[in-house]
């Protein structure tokens, strides 16, 4: 089973990781051979490079004692914002990454706060080009005493499809029932930061529901996620721990 899983991952280009500059980088290939690079910036901030394009997810300049210099990066073609909290939504970071051709894609609340952008609500779909599409999916809390953090219907997760490579960026959520509808995911970013998102037990349940080929726990703060690769080993999920504290 392990050899078969490795073979499938290799055929999909879902193997190997490398370091680029100051950030860990994982490189994947789409079925037609186009390269996709993921740079682990911080917490929930992800830089994605695809086919000459720059995609930034929830860019923030500062978190704890870590800072990100977005002025040293290329301007973004697309910026995705999941919700309004300060560890996901940073107006100044957006300004530093914007050019006249940049499209900012965000939920309704962030659109109001920013004053512009391509607004998406849960289940909206957006076709950006022949080979790029985005679907907004629910992201919310369900545990009693936590629902005020991320109420149902307000925030977004995103399924980003790049030349057939399906990437699930969950945003701040628990293991909600809607995850059963999320299928054929190649790469998933799932949050693990109690009490705001998932416990490690919830993340394992979510991973077993979604069954991504590769899983990056992210947004994990001080939560110990080191045991997740072992816990999900027999489920055929390649868990990669990067600096998404």
Language-model regions: role of each:
Residues 23-33, 41, 45-84, 91-95, ...:
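Pre-active-site segment of Zn-dependent metallo-hydrolases
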Residues 1-51, 231-235, 244:
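Zn-dependent metallo-beta-lactamase
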Residues 141-209:
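Active-site-proximal loop/helix segments of hydrolase catalytic cores
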Residues 115-132, 152, 204, 208-245:
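Binuclear metal-ion centers of metallo-dependent hydrolases, dominated by the metallo-beta-lactamase
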Residues 68-129:
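Active-site HxH/HxHxD metal-binding segment of metal-dependent hydrolases
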Residues 62-65, 85-89, 111-114, 125-127, ...:
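Active-site environment of divalent metal-dependent phosphoester hydrolases
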Residues 56-59, 76-87, 104-108, 168-171, ...:
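Active-site neighborhood of phospho(di)ester-bond hydrolases with catalytic His/Asp-centered motifs
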Residues 30-38, 49-55, 125-135, 161-167:
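Beta-strand-turn-beta hairpins that frame and shape the catalytic cleft
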């Amino acid at each position: 089973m392990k050899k078969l899983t490795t073979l499938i991952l290799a055929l999909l280009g879902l193997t190997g990781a490398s370091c680029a500059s100051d950030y860990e980088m994982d490189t994947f290939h789409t079925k037609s051979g186009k390269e996709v690079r993921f740079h682990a910036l911080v917490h929930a901030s992800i830089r994605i490079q695809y086919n000459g394009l720059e995609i930034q997810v929830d860019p923030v300049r500062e978190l704890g004692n870590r800072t990100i210099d977005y002025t040293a990066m290329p301007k973004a073609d697309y910026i995705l914002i999941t919700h309004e909290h300060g560890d996901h939504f940073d107006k100044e970071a957006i300004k530093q990454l914007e050019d006249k051709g940049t499209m900012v894609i965000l939920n309704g609340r962030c659109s109001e706060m920013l004053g512009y952008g391509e607004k998406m609500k849960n289940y909206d779909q957006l076709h950006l080009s022949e080979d790029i599409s985005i679907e907004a999916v629910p992201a919310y809390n369900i545990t009693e005493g936590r629902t005020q953090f991320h109420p149902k219907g307000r925030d977004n997760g995103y399924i980003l499809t790049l030349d057939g490579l399906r990437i699930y960026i969950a945003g701040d959520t628990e293991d909600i029932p809607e995850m059963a509808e999320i299928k054929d995911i190649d790469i998933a970013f799932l949050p693990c930061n109690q009490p705001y998102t998932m416990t490690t037990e919830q993340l394992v349940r979510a991973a077993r529901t979604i069954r991504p080929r590769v899983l990056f726990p992210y947004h994990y703060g001080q939560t110990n996620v080191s045991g997740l690769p072992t816990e999900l080993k027999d489920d055929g999920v390649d868990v990669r721990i990067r600096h998404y504290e």
